[in-house]
Design a protein with these regions (language model features):
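Conserved core positions of repeat-based scaffolds
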Residues: 56-60, 69, 109-113, 122, ...
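Beta-strand-rich domains and repeat architectures in extracellular enzymes and scaffolds
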Residues: 40-65, 74, 110
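Surface loop/turn motifs at the tips and blade-to-blade linkers of beta-strand repeat domains
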Residues: 39-42, 49-51, 93-95, 104-105, ...
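Tandem repeat domain/solenoid detector
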Residues: 116-119, 140, 151-156, 163, ...
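Conserved loop/turn at the beginning of each blade in beta-propeller domains
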Residues: 52, 82, 96, 104-105, ...
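Conserved strand-to-loop turn within each blade of WD40 beta-propeller repeats
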Residues: 63, 72-74, 107-108, 115-117, ...
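Short glycine/serine- and acidic-residue-enriched loop/turn motifs that recur at repeat junctions
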Residues: 2-39, 68-86, 125-139, 174, ...
Length: 325
């Protein structure tokens, strides 16, 4: 009988399903940055997201629903109003009273956070308008993004390197930021400074899940179809070629397969995406890496270490626990 191996997926800043009992086992000590926290502070942590190029920044929430940040603060990504590093946890007062539903981050890094009420806040690196506030100035404090989203409730967020996606409760996708390869889905390669609804083939579809790669984007609709757009120089869109796709395009190779969710996981190769078909079965879009799926231009089945992989459905309540090496 095959051993079922739970695989916690998500882009480090992506939420992962967990129960209250598993929260008690969240070992933040796996991340060196938490050595700067006292034992008392560690015991209060309820959710945590470590990000940055070297894992030198962290945002965490406490059992009292307070939000704290800590780290090098590159480009103001801690949201404290300055670019000074801090070796002591500092409360993010600008988000007082807000409960974190989900968050993601980019390479700058920039941070996109959705609250339990469906509001979107962004801050950090903004050279490519990835904050969605209409400027290219770095955001030193969380900025409420309401343009084209004022009457929308955001339920999921995703970040590429320098672009951002959000999913609303009515199944619409909005994108903004760097667009050199069409990853915003606007049909052009001009950067997008404010949220813009992704339409085209998604116009009359109800999207239930979104994900970003470095310079590409993916969406799953309620019928189980997968749509992709953006950079595909390594075949990561799964369309059978290596040409960029400036608007959403259905992945025909997945015809007849009902996909539940898609993922971009930092434990997978740089250009990889995983589509969850059902427990124990998955398909992967992947760029040129060693192994039997290297350079695949169309989806391939995924098996890790000879064991059946179960991709956990994401909740929007808990930020990812650390990968265990």
């Amino acid at each position: 009988m095959e051993e079922e191996l739970p695989l916690f997926c998500g882009e480090s800043g992506k939420p992962v399903q967990a129960t209250l009992s598993s929260l008690k086992m969240l070992d933040v000590g796996k991340w060196p940055i938490f050595s700067l926290c006292s034992e008392e502070e560690l015991q209060l942590i309820r959710q945590a997201c470590v990000f940055g190029s070297a894992g030198n920044e962290v945002l965490y929430t406490t059992v009292n629903d307070e939000i704290f940040v800590l780290g090098t603060n590159c480009c103001g990504c801690l949201g404290l109003g300055d670019v000074q590093s801090t070796i002591e946890p500092r409360r993010l007062d600008s988000l007082t009273g807000k409960k974190v539903a989900c968050l993601s981050y980019g390479s700058g890094p920039h941070v996109v956070l959705a609250t339990s009420e469906g509001e979107v806040f962004t801050w950090g690196h903004n050279a490519y308008s990835q904050l969605g506030n209409g400027t290219t100035n770095h955001g030193l404090v969380p900025c409420h993004i309401s343009t084209n989203l004022s009457n929308k409730r955001v339920i999921e967020v995703a970040c590429g390197s320098y672009h951002s996606l959000v999913l609303t409760s009515d199944g619409e996708v909005f994108a903004w930021g760097y667009n050199n390869s069409g990853q915003v889905g606007s049909g052009s390669t001009a950067n997008q400074p404010i949220p813009r609804r992704v339409t085209g083939c998604l116009q009359n579809k109800v999207v239930v899940n979104i994900a970003c790669g470095q310079m590409c984007s993916m969406a799953v609709v309620d019928t189980g179809e997968v749509y992709v757009w953006g950079y595909s120089g390594n075949g990561q869109l799964g369309l059978g070629g290596s040409g960029n796709q400036p608007t959403p395009c259905r992945v025909a190779a997945l015809q007849g397969i009902r996909v539940q969710r898609n993922y971009r996981d930092r434990s997978l190769p740089l250009y990889a995406h995983v589509c969850c078909q059902d427990p124990g079965r998955a398909r992967v879009h992947v760029g040129p890496v060693p192994g039997p799926v290297g350079g695949a231009a169309a989806p391939h089945a995924l098996l890790l270490h000879g064991r059946r992989v179960r991709l956990l459905r994401l909740s929007r309540r808990l930020v990812a626990p650390p990968h265990r090496g």
